[in-house]
Amino acid sequence: MPGKHQHFQEPEVGCCGKYFLFGFNIVFWVLGALFLAIGLWAWGEKGVLSNISALTDLGGLDPVWLFVVVGGVMSVLGFAGCIGALRENTFLLKFFSVFLGLIFFLELATGILAFVFKDWIRDQLNLFINNNVKAYRDDIDLQNLIDFAQEYWSCCGARGPNDWNLNIYFNCTDLNPSRERCGVPFSCCVRDPAEDVLNTQCGYDVRLKLELEQQGFIHTKGCVGQFEKWLQDNLIVVAGVFMGIALLQIFGICLAQNLVSDIKAVKANW
């Protein structure tokens, strides 16, 4: 009888996983670079790039930081995943997996701590908002962010309109010469749907009125309470978004690790 020849299939790198990871990270890389470019452009417009000390001069949060940090992280991850998959570089793929895993566990830890220490988080949020209320006129991006939050959640200040007493332009002291004295920003005002033109002076002198009278002109609920209410009302949607992000991260880690295993198996047969 003629001898039987056995054919062994040599291990190979899966093309589907490789190019899916490559394509996914190309998009991630481009988006990260776009975010980073927007952040740097915004800093350039505000003169921050020519005066780095301006970063620490602002008393509140500079929203541009969000673009720079998120864009930077996305760019680094996208670069590592994209080049790692294309060049079959196990170091970059492992870096991608570890970095993504670290972000995942930080998100998980933050979520657990936020649930366990709810009261502490609420106090820190109050403090954070009030620090930004103080710096309201210091930075146009911060001002726009606060106005957006107050309009979106129909709120005013961290706990209420009187938090605006912390701002030098809106406080009620006799030494305050500002026309905005004892007022609030226009974003606190109850908007009339019939009004076509925004009245930016609607909050002037409003805190001189009694609290019951104020309710007809401005939102009297604090943004911390309104944010908590919004979270409760949209809990399923918010949880779904975070679950989707978490699953995407886990999928990316598994895909990268699978690709690393394939590459090692191929190299072992050289």
Swiss-Prot record:
GO function terms (MF aspect): enzyme binding
BP terms from Gene Ontology: establishment of protein localization to organelle; regulation of membrane protein ectodomain proteolysis
Residue numbers on the Cytoplasmic membrane side: 1-19, 85-94, 256-270
InterPro entries documented for this protein: Tetraspanin/Peripherin, Tetraspanin_animals, Tetraspanin_CS, Tetraspanin_EC2_sf
Membrane topology of the entry: Multi-pass membrane protein
Keyword Glycoprotein attached: yes
Residues in compartment: Extracellular: 41-63, 116-234
Compartments where located: Cell membrane
Residues with attached carbohydrate: N51, N171
Primary localization: membrane
Transmembrane segments: 20-40, 64-84, 95-115, 235-255
PROSITE patterns reported in the protein's UniProt record: TM4_1 (PS00421)
Protein keywords: Cell membrane, Disulfide bond, Glycoprotein, Membrane, Transmembrane, Transmembrane helix
Presence of keyword Cell membrane: yes
Disulfide cysteine pairs (residue numbers): C155-C223, C156-C188, C172-C182, C189-C202
One GO term describing the cellular component: plasma membrane
Family: Belongs to the tetraspanin (TM4SF) family.
Subunit structure: Interacts with ADAM10; the interaction influences ADAM10 substrate specificity, endocytosis and turnover.
Function: Part of TspanC8 subgroup, composed of 6 members that interact with the transmembrane metalloprotease ADAM10. This interaction is required for ADAM10 exit from the endoplasmic reticulum and for enzymatic maturation and trafficking to the cell surface as well as substrate specificity. Different TspanC8/ADAM10 complexes have distinct substrates. Seems to regulate VE-cadherin expression in endothelial cells probably through interaction with ADAM10, promoting leukocyte transmigration.
The protein's name: Tetraspanin-17
Organism: Homo sapiens
Lineage, highest ranks first: Eukaryota, Metazoa, Chordata, Craniata, Vertebrata
